[in-house]
């Protein structure tokens, strides 16, 4: 009843205040709901179809293999063009490494097939040239200093043993075979040595340790050198022929030992 006595402005203000208090929780609830929806949307993982950054790693191989293939063909093409222009592309270090690998493989095969440990020791000792030279010098000194020292076919300076007809009571001579190394205590009077009888020892291949470098051609100039890769240029034969012709002409003019005359000297001689 007291409300009817209040002025109209007071009633209007009270109604607005009550309406705002009632509507404010609803707005807050809507805001929190919107925040929760946004947070859920942010926390959900993105699908691989929506994210353009996720790529398949197996497809990278299909791209890299053609790229490397094209690069190799491009290098071969460049070397071919340089060869046509007079250059030459070489990789000398790789050839030396391949030769060393082949020698190591052959040596390992011969050692594995050999079952005599003493023979392996002798082979390792004789592999060094200095040891071989010292051993030969020692054998030569012993054979010269000691008159009664027996002369074996392996000693330097000994005459070759020629097999001759055996007498009825004579013992067979010592077997001489230069295909493999003899161990200590091998001075046994047998016609065939133990190694040749079992046929376990292969022929020794002489190892060429001193490798001569590749002879450089006349007029060859190194243009580019990157590691093992080298590009060299050889002068054309026409330039060499011109030089030879000039040298021959100058040689004909100086047959009597006189120096070939220069154009200035020729003009002076003509004026005189």
Curated annotation (Swiss-Prot):
Residues 235-245 have a biased composition (Basic and acidic residues). Residues 80-272 are cytoplasmic. Residues 33-52, 146-171, 235-272 are annotated as: Disordered. The modification Phosphoserine is found at residues 110, 115, 245, 248. GO terms for cellular component: microtubule cytoskeleton; plasma membrane. Residues 156-166 have a biased composition (Pro residues). Induces activation of MAPK14/p38 cascade, when overexpressed. Induces apoptosis, when overexpressed. Interacts with RELT, RELL2, OXSR1 and PLSCR1. This is RELT-like protein 1. The lineage of its organism: Eukaryota, Metazoa, Chordata, Craniata, Vertebrata. The gene is Rell1.
């Amino acid at each position: 009843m007291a409300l009817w006595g209040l002025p109209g402005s007071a009633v209007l203000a009270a109604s607005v205040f009550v309406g705002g208090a009632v509507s404010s929780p609803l707005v807050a609830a809507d805001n929190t709901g919107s925040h929760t929806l946004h947070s859920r949307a942010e926390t959900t993982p993105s699908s691989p179809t929506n994210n353009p950054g996720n790529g398949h790693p197996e497809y990278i191989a299909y791209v890299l293999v053609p790229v490397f293939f094209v690069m190799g063909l491009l290098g071969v093409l460049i070397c071919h063009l340089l060869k046509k222009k007079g250059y030459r592309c070489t990789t000398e270090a790789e050839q030396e490494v391949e030769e060393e690998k082949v020698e190591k493989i052959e040596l390992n095969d011969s050692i594995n097939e050999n079952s005599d440990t003493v023979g392996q020791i002798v082979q390792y000792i004789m592999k060094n040239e200095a040891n071989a030279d010292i051993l030969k010098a020692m054998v030569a000194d012993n054979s010269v200093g000691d008159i009664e020292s027996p002369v074996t076919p392996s000693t330097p300076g000994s005459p070759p043993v020629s097999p001759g007809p055996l007498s009825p009571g004579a013992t067979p001579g010592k077997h001489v075979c230069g295909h493999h190394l003899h161990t200590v205590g091998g001075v046994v009077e047998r016609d065939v040595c133990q190694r040749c009888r079992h046929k376990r020892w292969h022929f020794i291949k002489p190892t060429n340790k001193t490798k001569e470098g590749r002879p450089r051609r006349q007029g060859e100039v190194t243009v580019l050198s990157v590691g093992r890769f080298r590009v060299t240029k050889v002068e054309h034969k026409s330039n060499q022929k011109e030089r030879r012709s000039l040298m021959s002409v100058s040689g004909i003019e100086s047959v009597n030992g006189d120096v070939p005359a220069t154009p200035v000297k020729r003009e002076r001689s003509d004026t005189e």
